Amino acid sequence: VNHTIFIIGTRPEITKIAPIANNLNSKILFTGQHFSKNMSNGFFDLIKNREIINLNLKRFKNFDNNIRFIANQLEIKLKKLNANKIIVQGDTNTTLVGAIATKTLNKKLYFIESGMRSFDISQIEEYNRLITSHLADINFCNHITNKENLLNEGVSKSKILVTGSTVYSAVNLVDSSIESIGEKKYILLTLHRPENVDKKEKLLNLLKTINKLNYRVIFPVHPRTKANLDKYDIQKLENIKFLKPKNYKDFIELIKYSKFIISDSGGVQEEAAIYRKPLLIPRQYTERPEMLNKFNILVKNNKELLMQSKNILNGNSCLEKPLLVTPLLYGKMKPIENIINGINNK
């Protein structure tokens, strides 16, 4: 039997492919790039009745420097599985490795969430996106701006499909089981990008700035960030509550009932928008510029972060009005149907 295989390796990839995998005869190949138990365990519950093959490649401590080797491991597995259609998602190292393995075997590659560009090539995610979209046979885009990016880079129109985003469907998988508790008085914080967490000074100043708001902050800590907090001996700050990573339902609940969110994550931009929560992005660039100043604000330094946070807390943020009236950008297009039709028919 020829199989359709998803290659994934991180929590956001699990959540974003779950609604598709649940409606498509497929298997899941998990590289284990997110390697701590509580990083992936509660997330696999989102996938129903599909075989999940865990390659457990976490034992290669330095995943990033073993791309060729890991691609080779994937090739061996894909051959055994007789896979003919392979799907990757997002912008992680697993995305790139999956794409390389697929094309080495000359199999058909489908790329979900293609065409996003921050135009900041110093970020590993940007070149993962760039290379994967040029290797893909079919690029599924969340938004028309993503399609335009690909056309500008010379990707053939016949290889591009604007489908909408699966995040809306992923949130729907858990929303109904979230208890109704109403908005709580806390800011939700997530940080994982190297530019924010890999340098002691940067990480410490960012946390100190957020602590200065004198407002309760809930901070589920990503393993990469946790390792650096330990390494730099950054102790708890009085207003910031450090938590272990949450499963998807609990994390979405934290978004739903937060006052506002500070996050450098791409997926959180979409999740926050669904609940119309103001979001501040502590980064220099974003790969979702179409959301800026409607659903979120890019804060390029700590001074801006402090100012915009105070504006939200004082009820005079420039996001107040747009958040009420802007239609959701990616969710209403039936992305699951569009992507499944694309996989079956192209």
Role assignments for model-derived ranges:
Residues H222:
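Conserved C-terminal portion of the radical SAM core fold
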Residues V217-F219:
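Short loop-to-beta-strand entry elements in the cores of soluble alpha/beta enzymes
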Residues V1-Y215, T225-K346:
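Nucleotide-activated sugar donor-binding and catalytic core shared by glycosyltransferases
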